[in-house]
Amino acid sequence: MTHQTHAYHMVNPSPWPLTGALSALLMTSGLIMWFHFNSMYLLMLGLTTNTLTMYQWWRDIVRESTFQGHHTPIVQKGLRYGMILFIVSEVFFFAGFFWAFYHSSLAPTPELGGCWPPTGITPLNPMEVPLLNTSVLLASGVSITWAHHSLMEGNRKHMLQALFITISLGVYFTLLQASEYYETPFTISDGIYGSTFFMATGFHGLHVIIGSTFLIVCFMRQLKFHFTSNHHFGFEAAAWYWHFVDVVWLFLYVSIYWWGS
């Protein structure tokens, strides 16, 4: 590394890909054990090792970028392409749920009563909690943009304030969604309506939790002065992800809550 004559990052040997693969094996095996034998020990072990692997792997990346200076502009460009491709893959992931929803709702079968929502299903009112959730996420999109602009201008205080507001709105959204799930008059086992509703909104909720975790890490890193106005890809990636989650919710709201009701 001392005689390096290029701007690329030659990664040092790391144990985390191996521990990540083993934890994934434990998690999938644990799911089978849970489904068939009602035992969660293997699943919990898999989740714990997976969480530890993610923490330690990302900790190493922070060290390489912030303290060792390995993330040159050309390396950051590669990371940006990687994040863009990851978000594109997530778009197709959600496209599958929307496809299932529209396939079922545009031509309801006789078993559903020939109508949508299916006979016997009482849909949620889109003008109540779902509309509040929409406004909460749209507001969080504004505050994350404020945080980004503050960081670009070197205004640390405003960046931290805006990031804190975004995290608070993300947590509030999750609590609202949990309370809505608690009150729904249908379940995931209520035919195609229940399964598409809970799969689509449930995975979106999971993405909000993941995005909130990313932003909390960014908040803690900013408290330690890790970001500068021209070196902050970790925050940029989290902001892109948050905007993606925001846009997916708009499609969910219009499709499943408003049109689908």
Curated annotation (Swiss-Prot):
Q: Which GO terms describe its cellular component?
A: mitochondrial inner membrane; respiratory chain complex IV
Catalytic activity line of the entry: 4 Fe(II)-[cytochrome c] + O2 + 8 H(+)(in) = 4 Fe(III)-[cytochrome c] + 2 H2O + 4 H(+)(out)
Query: Which InterPro entries does the record cross-reference, listed alphabetically?
Result: Cyt_c/ubiquinol_Oxase_su3 (IPR024791), Cyt_c_oxase_su3_dom (IPR033945), Cyt_c_oxidase-like_su3 (IPR000298), Cyt_c_oxidase_su3-like_sf (IPR035973), Cyt_c_oxidase_su3_a-hlx (IPR013833)
Protein topology in the membrane: Multi-pass membrane protein
- Gene Ontology molecular function terms on file: cytochrome-c oxidase activity
Give a GO biological-process term. Answer: mitochondrial electron transport, cytochrome c to oxygen
Q: Which residue ranges does UniProt annotate as crossing the membrane?
A: 16-34, 41-66, 73-105, 129-152, 156-183, 191-223, 233-256
Residues on Mitochondrial intermembrane side: 35-40, 106-128, 184-190, 257-261
Assigned protein family:
Belongs to the cytochrome c oxidase subunit 3 family.
Per UniProt, subunit arrangement is:
Component of the cytochrome c oxidase (complex IV, CIV), a multisubunit enzyme composed of 14 subunits. The complex is composed of a catalytic core of 3 subunits MT-CO1, MT-CO2 and MT-CO3, encoded in the mitochondrial DNA, and 11 supernumerary subunits COX4I, COX5A, COX5B, COX6A, COX6B, COX6C, COX7A, COX7B, COX7C, COX8 and NDUFA4, which are encoded in the nuclear genome.
Supply the PANTHER family for this chain: CYTOCHROME C OXIDASE SUBUNIT 3, CYTOCHROME C OXIDASE SUBUNIT III
Q: What is this protein's name?
A: Cytochrome c oxidase subunit 3
What is the organism of origin for this protein?
Halichoerus grypus (Gray seal)
Lineage, opening ranks: Eukaryota, Metazoa, Chordata, Craniata, Vertebrata
